[in-house]
């Protein structure tokens, strides 16, 4: 509903941190379990289509949408956004500094049950250690070609060279340091500011009229990144606790910046 307020073709890009919809975890893996898991992921895909349709409307032709998601749901995110009109471009890999193994350790579980064959399952696990997150990259279709689109709308290309990194930018991003913890930011999935700044800088030229929109603003990292880069932004967040955190972070960023424009949709 908040996105409905935005004008058609008004915004230039999108950096998002949505609920991941990773599905069921525990329970007996019977037919009903798999059926319910399938129903959940299809409901999740439909939910993505619902907000994706509105985002497609407000973005300029050639604008990119970047969507953080889990490795288990990235395919459904891409299909959902393609269904509403976006064109699939890439998947960016954000390689984190560490990952915690999750799932069943067969040897330890069998040992706790007194199973004599436990040692035979040494090193066997129900999942790999996950140390990367998928960032689905889609684009609103161009107007005929890239050059025509950038002349009309000032978006459509990706920055591949920058003083912030060496060589030609790849679709694997790593060596991003975590932000230091502070006493007031209680958001559980805060993305590193350096990462979000890198992504915004990669897909949005610093040209008047370009606006970053984040419909899942959370604690405000996208807003802070935009302020630091000197780019206008729109943030939408429904959780009142996160809104207050975002306001505090935005005000701190403004105090350290010459940019005095703030757009925070409550």
Residue ranges, per PLM feature:
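S-adenosyl-L-methionine-dependent nucleic acid methyltransferase catalytic domains
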Residues: 1-266
